[in-house]
Amino acid sequence: VHLTAAEKSAILDLWGKVNVGEIGAEALGRLLVVYPWTQRFFEKFGDLSSASAIMSNAHVKSHGAKVLASFSEGLKHLQDLKGTFAKLSELHCDKLHVDPENFRLLGNMIVIALAHHHPSEFTPCTQAAFQKVTAGVANALAHKYH
């Protein structure tokens, strides 16, 4: 992902204030509510019958935190996202058979959760930078599909 110095600074400044567990839980929860067909990958998580059930589900919260921890690791390796996410790409492609479009959708949910929790810092320029990063991560996760 090519970022300007200002974009990289905006990302890292905001990321220093992010509660990974909170943002991850909200992003994954929103994905499952807004795009209900994604729930089929999480059937073992128990009750996903309503928005409130999903957003309060301990398994969703835990996995969301895990997902965002991986995303956070990617922020440390912006010049090698494909390498950073190679094993996860292989897992999601070969074993889990996740539609790679879901990575883009989840990236959008991360952006929404960041805007929700950090409204004053989440300027249009910061959003543009995060959109670049989430697109780069989605592309890296989809790499093994190509």
Curated annotation (Swiss-Prot):
One of its GO terms (molecular function) is organic acid binding. Residues 2-146 form the Globin domain. PROSITE patterns: GLOBIN. Red blood cells. The keyword Protein biosynthesis does not apply. Heme b binds at residues 63, 92. Keywords: Acetylation, Heme, Iron, Metal-binding, Oxygen transport, S-nitrosylation, Transport. Transmembrane segments: none annotated. GO terms for cellular component: blood microparticle; haptoglobin-hemoglobin complex; hemoglobin complex. The modification N6-acetyllysine is found at residues 82, 144. The modification S-nitrosocysteine is found at residue 93. Pfam families: Globin. GO terms for biological process: hydrogen peroxide catabolic process. The modification N-acetylvaline is found at residue 1. InterPro entries: Globin, Globin-like_sf, Globin/Proto, Hemoglobin_b, Hemoglobin_oxygen_transport. Belongs to the globin family. Involved in oxygen transport from the lung to the various peripheral tissues. Heterotetramer of two alpha chains and two beta chains. PANTHER family: HEMOGLOBIN FAMILY MEMBER, HEMOGLOBIN SUBUNIT BETA. This is Hemoglobin subunit beta.
